[in-house]
A protein has these predicted regions:
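Positively charged, low-complexity intrinsically disordered leader regions
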Residues: 1-56, 60
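Active-site cofactor/substrate anionic-group-binding motifs, chiefly glycine-
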Residues: 42-43, 47-95
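Glycine-rich phosphate/diphosphate-binding loop of Rossmann-like nucleotide-binding domains
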Residues: 48-60, 142-220
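Short, structured coil segments at secondary-structure junctions
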Residues: 65, 95, 115-117, 172, ...
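Anion-binding alpha/beta catalytic cores of soluble intermediary-metabolism enzymes, centered on
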Residues: 90, 97-168, 260
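Rossmann-like adenosine-cofactor binding region
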Residues: 195-273
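Adenosine-phosphate binding glycine-rich loop
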Residues: 255-256, 261-304
Length: 304
């Protein structure tokens, strides 16, 4: 593994290895602290978008492993005044051992990684959110023991979370169902890849059909438009019936897990009652962002 840009860059063995290392690092932290695996290492954390979990978990993780992490708002860089991305990549690659970037466009991240000369980690783009999906898989494995053969259902917008969870679940040997309105399907290349797994993948626009007998049901915010705007109102209409409610989850297994990458818009993609009923799972998932990201850093920078 040279970078972590999207889930399809990984092999099934690499996914398992990341989760195994994350388990080890989490156990060590609970016992008093992680070994200084990043001593003498520097990590740039570039953010072009607001963040709570990604920023803080990377900052804490780098600190816990003895490294130096620098948070950088990209609006403060010369790139915000017209310096070419390729120049920024080649400069930061001379200063830092690794770069984490949360940005808008996946193609910018890919270009940056091709030129930086150091490992680059995707902190969220319009196409992929691999760190979050690794945390999801870690949480499922912690609570259910195994991933292979379990039914994972994603309900929501076919954006970065859907793209990444589909691929991540399939790499882990899960049966994956994606439930989206037809106008909000995942990326075409993700669907093409997923269908190569045959009966292990299913796409539907029927939420009840999708969650039927699911072991795990995941969702994410699907209305990011400003409240009251035409786009927001259109999305509210388009996603009628796609909210995770107690009624919808009656079709899933009685002990089904519910995951949400946060932040949550209660009353839109998930009801308040369902969120609170599954809060322990959801906040374990949030905590595990820290541990899987530490694992990725340890693998990329310390040869774990």
């Amino acid at each position: 593994m040279k970078h972590l840009l999207k889930m399809s860059d990984l092999t099934p063995g690499e996914v398992t290895h990341i989760l195994d290392v994350a388990d080890q690092l989490k156990a060590q932290q609970k016992l008093g602290g992680t070994a200084p695996l990043l001593a003498g290492k520097t990590v740039a954390m570039l953010f072009s978008k607001a963040s709570t979990r990604t920023r803080t978990s990377f900052e804490v993780g780098v600190y816990q492993m003895g490294g130096l992490g620098n948070y950088i708002n990209t609006s403060e860089l010369q790139a915000g005044r017209g310096e070419p991305l390729k120049d920024t990549a080649r400069v930061l690659g001379r200063y830092y051992d690794c770069v984490v970037w949360r940005t808008y466009r996946q193609r910018d991240l890919e270009e940056f990684a091709a030129l930086a000369g150091v490992p680059v980690i995707n902190g969220l783009t319009d196409y992929a959110h691999p760190c979050q999906v690794l945390a999801d898989l870690m949480t499922i494995r912690e609570r259910r023991g195994t991933l292979a053969g379990r039914k994972l259902c994603f309900v929501g917008d076919g954006g970065s979370m859907a793209n990444s969870l589909i691929v991540g679940g399939l790499l882990a040997g899960m049966q994956v169902t994606c439930v989206c309105p037809e106008a909000y399907r995942p990326a075409a290349d993700v669907l093409m890849l997923a269908h190569k797994y045959g009966s292990a993948f299913h796409f539907t626009s029927d939420p009840v059909e999708g969650v039927r007998d699911a072991d795990v049901v995941a969702t994410a915010v699907w209305n990011t438009a400003a409240p009251g705007t035409a786009e927001s109102e259109q999305r509210l209409r388009d996603f009628v019936g796609f909210q995770l409610t107690g009624k919808l989850l009656e079709a899933a297994k009685p002990d089904a897990m519910v995951l949400h990458c946060l932040p949550a818009h209660r009353g839109e993609e998930i009801s308040t009652a369902v969120f609170e009923q599954h809060a322990d799972e959801i906040f374990d998932e949030a905590e595990n962002r820290l541990h899987v990201q530490k694992a990725v850093l340890a693998i990329l920078l310390a040869g774990k």
